[in-house]
Amino acid sequence: MKKLLIMLIRFYQRYISPLKPPTCRFTPTCSNYFIQALEKHGLLKGTFLGLRRILRCNPLSKGGYDPVPEEFSFKPRRRWS
């Protein structure tokens, strides 16, 4: 199931994302973050982290560097910068 989700994200990156202007406010991009979260934390936790990141990526967000956390937590990390 994890591999299928990664394949869907890669499909989005290759065929859909190039058709749209870049809008992600974060580094790494939300789709790359989602893949890294799945690889590092597995299907359930990685999906939770990826969806939480996508919800944070909006015009009201400052964005910036936001890597996948080493340790999983349901609580969002505090960013003081």
Curated annotation (Swiss-Prot):
* Any Pfam family hit: YidD
**What superkingdom heads the lineage?**
Bacteria
What stretch or stretches form a coiled coil here? Answer: none
GO CC terms of this entry: plasma membrane
Q: Which UniProt keywords apply?
A: Cell inner membrane, Cell membrane, Membrane
**Location, primary (coarse class):** membrane
**Compartment list:** Cell inner membrane
Task: Tell me the SMART domains matching this sequence.
Answer: Haemolytic (SM01234)
Task: Report how it sits in the membrane.
Answer: Peripheral membrane protein
Return the PANTHER family for the record. Answer: MEMBRANE PROTEIN INSERTION EFFICIENCY FACTOR-RELATED
Family, per the entry?
A: Belongs to the UPF0161 family.
Mind telling me which NCBIfam families this protein's record contains? membrane protein insertion efficiency factor YidD
Q: What does this protein do?
A: Could be involved in insertion of integral membrane proteins into the membrane.
Its recorded name reads Putative membrane protein insertion efficiency factor
The taxonomic lineage of its organism, from the top, reads: Bacteria, Thermotogati, Thermotogota, Thermotogae, Thermotogales
